[in-house]
């Protein structure tokens, strides 16, 4: 497993400064945002992704994965993104999200997504990369692991696999759902996101909010024991998506989070 950091919360920093920070925090690489409002926009990918990879490599960092908003092989810059990523040595590409349209649409949407993924799989094969669907809680078609398995069951996971996020999985199934989700998706898992959630009451309603690792719903030791058991070798992307924190506070918390993860990895 390679520990990388998701760049989303650090985009106010120039990339060289961000790279210095990431190296100092002890990460092995970066999960770089290549999407609208990302470090790199889709329009810039051909020119700027190679530059970004070189900047980070100069600081001893890999870029094993990028985060995109791609949901169709036909959309503008989709093929350019896959091609450029491959040329830069980026192996893993996070896809965008398909929103659930509401009751009565589930089965037709599963079929619709499968059709889109067939073309995305062709891009993955052409450029020797792995695309991943992220288990994001809420009104996303990939929120529930069992539904994601139904979507992915006929695809080669080395071309189109699962990008699991135990934090989001625990939001959807905090007792046994996350565990059954890892179980059903085990052979499909190619990327892992790390963040934790807790439930809080706000204005009379329960909301899920990001909390420091080890303080939320996810039993991280068990998660990493399972990943070791299934011989997971892909990137582990740490998501410092804390709300209400300054950048300095996010950096401080991220240092604590990576220490927490490394201590677990050393002990299992």
Region annotations inferred by a language model:
Residues 221-223, 231, 235-236:
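H/E-rich (His + Asp/Glu) clusters that bind or coordinate divalent metals
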Residues 1-95, 99, 115-118, 125, ...:
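N-terminal pre-domain/capping segments
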Residues 61, 90-91, 129, 230-234:
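A short helix->loop->beta-strand "cap" motif at the edges of active sites that frequently abuts
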Residues 10, 237-248, 252:
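A short, acidic, flexible beta-alpha connecting loop/helix-capping segment that sits on the rim
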Residues 91-106, 127-138, 237:
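Active-site groove signature of glycoside hydrolases
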Residues 38-41, 70-74, 100-102, 137-141, ...:
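Short, small-residue-enriched loops and turns at beta-alpha junctions
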Residues 19, 122-217, 224:
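Acidic/histidine-rich catalytic cores of soluble enzymes
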Residues 44-50, 77-81, 107-117, 144-149, ...:
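Charged helix-capping and loop-helix junction motifs
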